[in-house]
Amino acid sequence: MTRTDSSSASLEAFSLPEEDGGFLLKHLYLKHSSFSHRFSWVDTFLSGFEGKRIGRKGIQALETAINKEIMDRGYVTSRVYIEPQDLSKGTFYFTLLPGIVSDIRFSPDTWGTWRNAAAVHKGSLLNIRGIEQTLDNFNHVPGQKAHIRIEPGEKEGDCVLLIELQRERPVSLFMTLDNSGMKETGKLQQTYGLRISNPLSMNDLFYFSWNGDAEPGSDRKGTHGVNLFYDIPLGKDRMTLSYAHDDYRQTVDYSVVPFISSGKLERTRLTWSHLLQRKAYSKTDLLAGILHKTRHSYIDGTEIGVQRQKTTALELGIHHKRYIKESLVEGELTYRRGVPWLADPGPTDGMAGEATTRYNMYLGSLHVTTPVPVAEDYRLRYTMDLYFQKANQPVYGSEFLSIGGRYSVRGFDGENTLAAESGVVMRNELAIPLGKSGQEIYGAWDYGRVYGPSTQYLLGKELTGCALGFRGEKGPFRYDGFIGWPIEKPEGFQTAKRTYCFLISAEI
């Protein structure tokens, strides 16, 4: 169930107007209908005026206050009204005229279906939050823009929802080029992808991408991978399925006999989300999912059996998004539990104090974006991203949180990292728009810390770095580049004095 009601400051501050005469009303209530349970707060509100003398102005003021509150709670086509009644008996009631959705339909010449995207249904009580969720489901599809008109129905209080869709580019191609790779496997990395909007005509989304190193061909080092993604709305729910397969190979030259080390990683995730609450400036979703991973490691093509991994984990979390004036705050908290389904036990599972695949882990993230006024018509933008991981038991390295690189602590080249069972990363950024060009320069300051049993084998636990960058877009192209510097690192931790990073992407 989606909650849309809350206590109202305007009702709490309401007072009856002063007037002479009136009737002594011992009982005030809302006349019951099939939807009265949605408006139980009206009875609570009215009970506060029982035993008082109320005249015509007072009754009209109550009606106005209740209808304003109904509107504020999103029931934009519902209202209360006053039926003829004898007030001399000391009883007074309001009658509810519920706003019912009598029909939902597409505008003419629109193909596809609205049924799985609609968060409202025929015969339901119309709430504007349901329309907003429906719009989100339609507009979640790239190249698709929805508008919903509320038109009067045949009966008083009834309404018809007319959905108008604008669609463009149902199929698009995209590519990226960056230098996020490792020296041993290829610094230059490339991605090519295909995205299809509405592949099943159900406001769904599918994309496929291939990625790999972009350096001269060699059998002795490199990476390549495949990603699949499918997403479909189901009213107040959403289902997402993703799959990733990555291969890498590198030559180990510092041994007596050089050899090729390689590996394969697969990751499959099924996620379900459900809208718990939606208000004018916030929404909350319940999240649940299952994550399955496999890992294989090889030396000169021969698998290292002891390093083989096949794990499954369940996830349960909550996601909250809130607008506070012109700022956005978005947070997520997830509990992850390793389970034996479709999984193989780890070599040290069940050993006290050793790594296990049956772990309990908490993960969280917080995103804040807020404008920083510096002149009447000019603002900077501050962004903060915080995420953490807390494992309650020792876990295998594949579950570690790693810091030191462009996606964690900028200013480090990523060739060496600090990784452990638990940790926290905070990324701060101040962006300066360059007029209305769609470009900006930005400064970044990042901090990361890892902790857990494995830190005893590390050179240290903390990294701090900074960066100065430039990003923007022009036509189908987007670009981002920055120079980063390490500020604080453990003694002996090897990284470049300056890190140069870039990313170029295009979509057609």
Q: What residue ranges belong to the model's regions?
A:
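Periplasmic polypeptide-binding modules associated with outer-membrane biogenesis and secretion
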Residues: M1-G181, G193, N211-H224, M384-L386
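Strand-connecting loop/turn motifs
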Residues: Y75, G143, P170, S201-N203, ...
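Gram-negative/organellar outer-membrane beta-barrel architecture
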Residues: W111, N127-S327, T495-E507
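Extracellular loop and loop/strand-boundary signature of outer-membrane beta-barrel proteins
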Residues: G123, D178-S180, D213-P216, Y254-F259, ...
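Transmembrane beta-barrel strands of outer-membrane/channel proteins
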Residues: I150, M175-N179, Y192, F206-G212, ...
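Residue-level signature of outer-membrane beta-barrel architecture
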Residues: I196-N198, I232, H274-L276, H320-R322, ...
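C-terminal outer-membrane beta-barrel translocator/porin domains of Gram-negative envelope proteins
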Residues: Y298-Q439, G443-Y447, Y451-P453
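Predominantly the C-terminal beta-signal and adjacent terminal strand-loop region
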Residues: E473-I508
